[in-house]
């Protein structure tokens, strides 16, 4: 078994995300005074008194026939199944409500340990109200204040009491982290679901359904992966709501946290300028990149369509000429099987080291094929090259004068290195340095 799992559940707007962020120690779950802001399961690692555990925030459970409410309830139920301990969050200002009683009925059926938290008890006078919560049937209620951070220690003490029989293990460093980025409604969530076969992320045809960066852990070919499914990035001019702003920042953070970035395009709508801007973030961050053309099932096509679309991709994304282009459909799952091998290859190449002697043979052969440039009568001299870093692979070429290294010749050397070693899916960087 892995680390203990703690799920926070409750009706909407009782402060689940605020408490989640308090315990996790960073702003992972988006917080607003609007019911329904958290709609998926949000994961984070946390620690209390030397106990490492995984924490899950969930959407507010509401009773109703609307499909979206049913989806959120289903997400919360999955979180409860995963959990070893459940924090049942209520609102001390509003007292016990009918909605709380409905959540309690669901919790009874789980037969999991439940710790009852009464949030928004912001001053001592409000403590008198918490006794009503005994009626929910989960023993002693713990008064807390997410706004002020009060009472969390007692709550976490009670939660960690249930960890005693759960062995702790930590995730290994070899875990590959990758994310899917793209503008809203290109099918990122659907791709995640198609890949891992579980309704991990709420899928809806409303653009912007996934508001938070949501980590999903899974194993593929005996290797561990973490996939970060990010909120769709909108054009800056359309980022009106504060929530949307947080989501864009979170998506950029997800790129920073990832080793491989899958840039998802809409095969039906084609390529727009925003797609290039989004892909540019990943390239500039030095991440490995895989280009995914989704919704290919919806495209009218003949034997030339795929080749023509790939040519458009290459034309629009000239800076990503190293990235493979995959065509697939999350809806029909056609060619979904090509995504993980491409991610694995990109990850391996992103971390690849080459032997210095072979590298220098390649460089010298390149110089013999295409002599170095001259400027004002001075010719560039290349003495030797070495690899100085990975993620991305980075090379330093020692020369007589770095100013003589024209970008076109640097590009030529990059192409020769790629011809020799591959490096599909990853940028490589070359820097000229004066030999001392």
UniProtKB/Swiss-Prot annotation:
Keyword GTP-binding: yes
Listed GO biological process terms: ribosome biogenesis
One Pfam entry name: KH_dom-like
Binding-site residues, GTP 1: 10-17, 57-61, 119-122
Coiled coil: none
Keyword Repeat recorded: yes
EngA-type G domain: residues covered: 4-167, 176-351
Residues annotated as domain KH-like: 352-436
GO function terms (MF aspect): GTP binding; ribosome binding
Keywords: GTP-binding, Nucleotide-binding, Repeat, Ribosome biogenesis
InterPro entries assigned: G_ENGA, GTP-bd, GTPase_Der, KH_dom-like, KH_dom-like_a/b, P-loop_NTPase, Small_GTP-bd
Residues that bind GTP 2: 182-189, 229-233, 294-297
Reported function: GTPase that plays an essential role in the late steps of ribosome biogenesis.
Family: Belongs to the TRAFAC class TrmE-Era-EngA-EngB-Septin-like GTPase superfamily. EngA (Der) GTPase family.
PANTHER family given in the database record: GTPASE DER
Complex and partners: Associates with the 50S ribosomal subunit.
Name of this protein: GTPase Der
Source organism phylogeny: Bacteria, Bacillati, Bacillota, Bacilli, Bacillales
Gene that encodes it: der
